[in-house]
A protein has these predicted regions:
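Acidic, PIN/NYN-like endoribonuclease modules and their adjacent C-terminal/linker elements
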Residues: 1-4, 108-143
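Acidic catalytic patch
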Residues: 46, 71-95
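Active-site-proximal, substrate-binding regions of enzyme catalytic domains
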Residues: 50-78
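Conserved glycosyltransferase catalytic-site signature
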Residues: 13, 103-104
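Beta-rich strand-turn-strand
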Residues: 98-99
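Short, well-structured N-terminal submotif of metal-dependent ribonuclease cores
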Residues: 1-43, 58-68, 142
Length: 143
């Protein structure tokens, strides 16, 4: 696992899914694969859960494949647990920024791990949260 002080990027589940599931949007799939290949990321237990359930449902991953993926996430990336602190901060973020319940936990997890950039396709490209976390669409023109 990477040292958290050396990792500045948090990657939301949608980008992982473009990389793992062959999509009709080849540009997004290629960009996601390149981004993942070139970086170590901060992710959360929630991201792992979302990726796994979608791979089971959409790509028919079996349990061996899911177990291998979980192990690789923990070996190759910094994984943030969902703690009471993360959940309480998520509530504050929901109130202030009007994110969904799940998105606020992602944002809170990224802030908790001191990420500078949160890559997410669906959370407002360019938005700066708490003056220190910038949301970037990995498929947008600025990516």
């Amino acid at each position: 696992m990477a040292e958290t002080s050396l990792v500045n990027y948090f990657l939301d589940s949608n980008t992982w899914l473009y990389a793992f599931i062959e999509s009709q949007d080849q540009m997004k799939s290629d960009r996601a694969k390149r981004l993942i290949h070139d970086n170590v990321f901060i992710i959360s237990a929630q991201v792992i859960n979302e990726v796994c359930i979608n791979l089971i449902r959409k790509a028919h991953f079996d349990e061996v494949g899911i177990q291998q993926l979980i192990v690789s996430f923990y070996l190759e990336h910094y994984v943030v647990d969902i703690t009471r602190e993360v959940l309480l901060r998520a509530s504050e973020i929901r109130s202030r920024y009007r994110f969904s319940f799940w998105d606020s936990i992602i944002v809170s997890s990224a802030l908790n791990a001191n990420a500078a950039i949160l890559y997410s396709e669906d959370m407002g490209d360019g938005l700066v949260v708490d003056g220190r976390l910038t949301i970037r669409n990995p498929f947008g023109p600025s990516a």
